[in-house]
UniProtKB/Swiss-Prot annotation:
Chain positions found as N6-succinyllysine: K61, K252, K267, K316
Keywords, ordered alphabetically: Acetylation, Fatty acid biosynthesis, Fatty acid metabolism, Lipid biosynthesis, Lipid metabolism, Mitochondrion, NADP, Oxidoreductase, Transit peptide
Disulfide-linked positions: none
GO molecular function: enoyl-[acyl-carrier-protein] reductase (NADPH) activity
Transit peptide: 1-53
Gene this protein is translated from: MECR
Active-site residues, record numbering mapped to chain: Y94
Protein's name according to its UniProt entry: Enoyl-[acyl-carrier-protein] reductase, mitochondrial
InterPro entries recorded: ADH-like_C (IPR013149), ADH-like_N (IPR013154), GroES-like_sf (IPR011032), Mito_Enoyl-ACP_Reductase (IPR051034), NAD(P)-bd_dom_sf (IPR036291), PKS_ER (IPR020843)
Residues with PTM N6-acetyllysine: K61, K252, K267
Subunit structure: Homodimer.
Domain of life, per lineage: Eukaryota
Organism, as annotated: Bos taurus
Compartments, record wording: Mitochondrion
Residues involved in NADP(+) binding: 167, 193-196, 216-218, 285-288, 310-312, 368
Amino acid sequence: MWVCGALCRTRAPAQLGQRLLPESRRRRPASASFSASAEPSRVRALVYGHHGDPAKVVELKNLELAAVGGSHVHVKMLAAPINPSDINMIQGNYGLLPQLPAVGGNEGVGQVVAVGSGVTGVKPGDWVIPANPGLGTWRTEAVFGEEELITVPSDIPLQSAATLGVNPCTAYRMLVDFERLRPRDSIIQNASNSGVGQAVIQIAAARGLRTINVLRDTPDLQKLTDTLKNLGANHVVTEEELRKPEMKSFFKDVPQPRLALNCVGGKSSTELLRHLAPGGTMVTYGGMAKQPVIASVSQLIFKDLKLRGFWLSQWKKDHSPDQFKELILTLCDLIRRGQLTAPACSEVPLQDYLCALEASTQPFVSSKQILTM
């Protein structure tokens, strides 16, 4: 997710950087390192050595694969998406930054190839996803610690598994954790065509909630509207329509939302607040407009509106690995029942990463870029 303003940037564990040390500098075993051999390795990865424009700093490198032993797991990556948070991390504008050089990618799905003698929770053939961000999923294969992985069922679609660990988890937690919503209650959200937005629509529909979905007025507005309604959206309005006085009559027929989900900020978040029911909550999980969230004194005093933030990485820190696994299994049940699908995706071979990076940063591109290995 895009995050604006100065953030407190914690550093990912040191072993992330150790995985990419040149052979001459390695002092202990690591999951992978830059190949010191002139012969290309069979392990390829998208690596960045400093922060900046992803198209300029990300390179396709050959890495060495460490031996599998102890609690290590050899994973062949199958697919990994490019999320806004991945772009922010490469740019250096995120709340968690791995040590450099680093492999890009925080999300994806892989298949276990081999396990060390101390591994008890996974076996060859299992599908796995990262337990936490910063693992570096834009690579063909790697050796990870068992604790860095979570198993997922292999009977769900590959694209769903590859995009399971970030956006659907964020959507579910925001719908469940901030307001006690009952069937037929309304929520309102901006950036409705984003990965989180599409997951919100589907999970809300599965829970009997109504969604009011705000979009920018784009050239393909009708196509986006049809897509969201096919996912279960009840209402789709543009940013411009939301500002019009006619919205008062709209909310005579539709209950005012008790929950607003903001990924934009600026004027867009101001409009979400304006239409919230008294006592309602706006949860901010991104800032695509790179503008502050502004609430009036009257909204806070007379409507008692609540402003909250959500970051999945912090939620994971505050909850146990078993609770995250339970969340993943809950989402997998929705996928199996046909109530949660992956966002529209474009699969791009790893070697064509520049095309994927460019598409992922272009406006009005609603298809998520997924790197295939």
